[in-house]
Structures are given as C-alpha cells and as structure tokens.
Amino acid sequence: SKNWKLSIRCGGYTLKVLMENKLLPEPPSTRKKRILESHNNTLVDPCEEHKKKNPDASVKFSEFLKKCSEMWKTIFAKEKGKFEDMAKADKAHYEREMKTYIPPKGEKKKKFKDPNAPKRPPLAFFLFCSEYRPKIKGEHPGLSIDDVVKKLAGMWNNTAAADKQFYEKKAAKLKEKYKKDIAAYRAKGMPNSAKKRAVKAEKSKKKREEEEDEEDEQEEENEEE
C-alpha cells in the first residue's frame, strides 16, 4: 500500500527500488508486509550510514529522503547484479513464508447459499409495508424509495398497539413455520444440485490458483534470463 511504501523509503529503500523493478512482489496485507520487513535487515542501508557520519546535521525530513533516494539510485546502478541476487533470495523467502501463511480470523470465506433453502420470514413491520406500499405509491407516484419507506415508518409508528398485533401474530406464525422448515432442510442435508455447485466452485478456485502459480514460475524464468 502507499503508506507501507512510505514507511520503508528511508529505513529500507532497497525494497521499494526492487519492487519498482518488478524483482520483488509487493505484499498485499500487514502480515505479508512483516515477512519482507524481517528479511530487510540483511540489506545495506546508506541512509543509516549518512546519519552516523552526520549526527549533528539539521536536515528536513523531505530533504533527507531525497538524498537517500539519490544515493540508492547510484548504488543500484553500480551494483545491480548484487541487488538482483538479494531480490531473488527475498522472493524465495517470501514464497516459503506465504505457503504457511494463515489468514487472520477476521478473513472469513464466503459461505455457499443454496437458493432452494427456506427463506427467513419477514418481521411484522415488513408485513405491514408489503400491504400498504402499493397504496402509497398509487397516491404519490413521484415519491422516491426513501420517502416511501419514511411514510411507511411513520404510519407504523402511529398504528395502535392492538392493530399491530395482527402483523406481529402473523410474523410469529411464519417464524415458527421457518424453524420447522429449516430443521427439516438441515436434517436432509445439502441437496445434490447444491453439492454439485459447491464442488464446481471449489474446482474453479483451484484451477485459478494453479494458473497463478504457473504465471509466477514463468515470471521467475524470465527474470533469470
């Protein structure tokens, strides 16, 4: 990301140069960022040398970064082969680490939804809306969806508790029916058609991953040439 690139401009400008020359992949997440940063300690850092040689120098940070950038460009041009070897070593290390990479708990896979599974029943308010929405649209054809919803909400709030019970009881019956239907559905297990779709989706995902691996291998071969 942009912020991560900025954070390594001085302390490890080598990585930015290598990524710009497509010698090292840019990590798309924080976990992957740490993989590369841990390996960055093996790289030479002229910026640190500059600070040691000039401890009392008062320089603006922007000017300091500019100076580091110029120094790295000069070094990279002179010792290109050395940096290419280091980049390949970093890339190999990166790929080894990524093979054992486990996504954070927050990254959940999208669950497969069977279109034939029982649908959740609407709440009392939505049953009320489905009855009165056509009437409001007929009386106010120019109203936007948001305005229609606001009118329905106002009508619901002004409806007497006794009148609301009609919709609440209806919603309760639909909820009980849903509980029975979903229990029966789960007892039977996933239908064959749904299983086939899930298997097909998994195969497609595996095929995409294999194609990406082949592309990475091809890129490595091209770099070696």
Curated annotation (Swiss-Prot):
Domain SAND: 1-25
Classification via SUPFAM superfamilies: HMG-box, SAND domain-like
Protein name: Nuclear autoantigen Sp-100
DNA-binding region residue numbers: 26-102, 118-186
Compositionally biased region (Acidic residues): 210-225
Organism of derivation: Gorilla gorilla gorilla (Western lowland gorilla)
Molecular function GO terms recorded: DNA binding, bending
Span list, region Disordered: 185-225
Basic residues compositional bias, start-end: 194-206
Coiled-coil ranges (or none): 157-224
Subunit structure: Homodimer. Interacts with members of the HP1 family of nonhistone chromosomal protein, such as CBX5 and CBX3 via the PxVxL motif. Interacts with ETS1; the interaction is direct and modulates ETS1 transcriptional activity. Interacts with the MRN complex which is composed of two heterodimers RAD50/MRE11 associated with a single NBN; recruits the complex to PML-related bodies. Interacts with HIPK2; positively regulates TP53-dependent transcription. Interacts with CASP8AP2; may negatively regulate CASP8AP2 export from the nucleus to the cytoplasm.
Record lineage: Eukaryota, Metazoa, Chordata, Craniata, Vertebrata
Record bears the keyword Glycoprotein: no
Cited function: Together with PML, this tumor suppressor is a major constituent of the PML bodies, a subnuclear organelle involved in a large number of physiological processes including cell growth, differentiation and apoptosis. Functions as a transcriptional coactivator of ETS1 and ETS2. Under certain conditions, it may also act as a corepressor of ETS1 preventing its binding to DNA. Through the regulation of ETS1 it may play a role in angiogenesis, controlling endothelial cell motility and invasion. Through interaction with the MRN complex it may be involved in the regulation of telomeres lengthening.
Keyword annotations: Coiled coil, Cytoplasm, DNA-binding, Nucleus, Phosphoprotein, Repeat, Transcription, Transcription regulation, Ubl conjugation
Record PTM: Sumoylated. Sumoylated with SUMO1. Sumoylation depends on a functional nuclear localization signal but is not necessary for nuclear import or nuclear body targeting. Sumoylation may stabilize the interaction with CBX5. Phosphorylated.
Motif (Nuclear localization signal): 66-83
Keyword Aminoacyl-tRNA synthetase belongs to the record: no
PROSITE patterns in the cross-refs: HMG_BOX_2 (PS50118), SAND (PS50864)
GO cellular component terms attached to this protein's record: cytoplasm; PML body
GO biological process per UniProt: negative regulation of endothelial cell migration; negative regulation of protein export from nucleus; regulation of angiogenesis; regulation of extrinsic apoptotic signaling pathway via death domain receptors; regulation of Fas signaling pathway; regulation of transcription by RNA polymerase II; telomere maintenance
Location of the protein in the cell: Nucleus; Nucleus, PML body; Nucleus, Nuclear body; Cytoplasm
